């Protein structure tokens, strides 16, 4: 909000040449510099004739959190889950994998699998593995969380995920695509937890050329949650052939020895 001829007016984000005078009704408690959502109530022949009404109040534009709320509002981001979605999600409170289903999948829990994300990431949806093969070359694994095992086509969860399309990370917060029982729980490849995944196992030669690959439904167990800063420091120290220890990010925990071996 800004002042226009002594009256409160709004200036749309990204459109500095257009201003709408605010109706007094509904503008109570709104101050200069506030972020608001507004509805155009009248379009005049001149900019000074435009009128608008406040429909949502956020707070001072001096605060990033209030600006973020306004941006999300302006893009119609869904902040809350509908009751029917939350009801379906409650079935996965503290869920663990179905052992009968696990018996029909390729068991990859014995190999060193790890994830690399930001320290703040909660919904961990992909992991990697790398092993030297006895007959030479390597097996590179890319493992994607098998969300489709839990989110069935046509369900309330499926419809909501379709509408949201992705989790949204902004500032120090996240708006998940799925309720936390799934996004942070049974569908997240958390360390030291058995999880269902789709895995692509690629056979590479010594030069990294792909010799073959296959896709499998799998059950995996991530050994460690790696973070970008930690992995970069590790790779830089290896490139410099230094023996100085690399400090792990506190949010990720200690660096797993098996992950170190995979990167050597």
Regions found by a protein language model. Name each.
Residues 1-141, 148-193, 232, 239-249:
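Charge-lined substrate channels and their catalytic hotspots, especially those that engage the 3′ end
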Residues 143-145, 203:
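Short beta-strand segments
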Residues 168-264:
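Conserved catalytic alpha/beta cores of large enzymes that bind or transform nucleotide phosphates
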């Amino acid at each position: 909000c800004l002042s226009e001829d002594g009256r409160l007016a709004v200036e749309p984000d990204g459109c500095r040449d257009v201003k709408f005078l605010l109706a007094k009704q509904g503008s109570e408690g709104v101050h200069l510099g506030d972020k608001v959502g507004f509805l155009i109530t009248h379009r005049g022949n001149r900019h000074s004739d435009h009128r608008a009404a406040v429909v949502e109040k956020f707070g001072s534009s001096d605060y990033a959190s209030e600006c973020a709320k306004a941006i999300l509002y302006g893009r119609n981001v869904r902040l809350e889950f509908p009751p029917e979605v939350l009801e379906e999600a409650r079935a996965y409170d503290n869920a663990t994998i179905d052992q009968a289903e696990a018996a029909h999948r390729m068991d990859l829990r014995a190999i060193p699998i790890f994830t690399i994300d930001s320290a703040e990431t909660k919904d961990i949806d992909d992991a990697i593995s790398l092993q030297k093969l006895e007959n030479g070359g390597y097996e590179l694994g890319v493992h994607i969380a098998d969300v489709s095992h839990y989110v069935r086509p046509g369900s309330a969860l499926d419809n909501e995920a379709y509408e949201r399309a992705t989790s949204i990370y902004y500032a120090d917060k996240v708006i998940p695509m799925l309720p936390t029982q799934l996004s942070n729980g049974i569908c997240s490849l958390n360390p030291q937890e058995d999880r269902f995944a789709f895995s692509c196992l690629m056979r590479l030669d010594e030069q990294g050329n792909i010799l073959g690959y296959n896709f499998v439904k799998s059950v995996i167990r991530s050994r460690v949650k790696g973070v970008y800063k930690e992995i970069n420091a590790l790779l830089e120290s290896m490139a410099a052939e230094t023996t100085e220890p690399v400090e792990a990010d506190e949010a990720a925990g200690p660096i797993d020895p098996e992950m170190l071996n995979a990167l050597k």
